[in-house]
Amino acid sequence: MINLFITASKYIQLLLIVLYTYCNFRYLSIPDQEDADPLCDWQLRIILLVHFLMNCIIYLKTADMSAVWFYLLQLAFFLLYTFGAQRLYRNINRLLLNNTVFFLTYGLIMLERLDAAKAMKQFVIIVGAAALTLVIPYLIDKIWDLVRWRFAFAAFGILLQGVVLIIGATSYGAKMSISIGGFTFQASEIVKITFVLAMAGMLSRATEFRDIVLSSLVAAAHVLVLVACKDLGSALIFCLAYLVMLFIATNRSLYLVLGTAAMGGASVFSYAAFSHVRKRVFAWINPWADIDDRGYQITQSLFAIGTGGFAGLGLYQGMPNRIPIVEKDFIISAISEEMGAITAICIILVCLGCFMQMMVIATYMEDSFYKLVAVGLAIEYIVQSFLTIGGAIKFIPSTGVTLPFISYGGSSLVSAFIVFAIIQALYIIQGNEDEADELEELEEYEETPDDEDEALEEDNAENDAYASEQVSAEDLDL
């Protein structure tokens, strides 16, 4: 009976995630969010049902009561976070809010299956990050004038990465993290946000060519420090974000061509200069030639994806732990093995849906600074997702970056929450401005009939006065 329930739940989950993905793109075709609210309500119900079914399987497979309590804690958080955010911000984008819960759901399910202790640690960070970032929309809307801090953001990013270069810990050939007070964090996850804010501030105020040169030099300084740290995945994300922001700000395709050529040259240099890059490229080109060493990680990832098929083997039915650092770079492979390629494809499509929604928000922004911030963060988000998934399926060499909200890692998680909070802030600001404009138009419309009535009364009074004068004149004639 238990096996029957597990098998049925697997296929129900597939049906539900396909339906959720459909709702995600259906939302994008509805211009008015109020009309899309019922769709968002259904999305939330689908997420919670998937969450319940998968946690039932976890309990049945582990027979551990702590799994039940952990599920209840997650459920309470999801409900509180979702409805609390909507209560705090009337104009919040519910699609991005639902997708955040969607990603967190699948990330926690797979992490609990892989390592329950890491899942609990991840959940604690989730709660803290969610609570802290809920105030970001208010701060940006009411308090912060971010464009004034553009040079401070740039200096902070370069200095922080410089600290990593000097005292950072080396992991898989690259210096990416530093430890402070027993806490380890990946600096580039924070710097990628300050980088976008700095570049958006500079480009939105650029009026001459020398302003473009200055912003390009600052961007190059960020990238060069990352290259010196051998964190080439982050360097690529920064480069692509800046190139797109530069194109949006100037509308000159020449910058895209020159930037792409420079990135091509930098790639050749990186291959020649860094041994860990050559190792990853070799593993990408022919992992089977050294399957026990350099090609082991990618081959195990491909085996997992192939073994899972479209429907997946089911939770606890596969062997995802054989993939090195599966909970970070290759978590999409674990999801594909046990929950199916259909689930993995739907997650990819929801990532794409988030990117599309971010770009839609960017097009709505009237302020050039806010527009560039939305574009920059959207590009960073989709490029990071592409690098993670592309590396796991052998589409591109592995870069060591994580999948936002899903992969294990505190720095990545906090960074993703901040990115989505900033995008939400921009959406809320624009929504508030639209409401203010509509209210002003309504007040003008309501005042117009009164003006017409007053004019009509004046005309009537003039006509009455004229008629009285005519009558008086006739009386005098008599």
Predicted features along the sequence, with ranges:
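Hydrophobic transmembrane alpha-helical segments in integral membrane proteins
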Residues: M1-I17
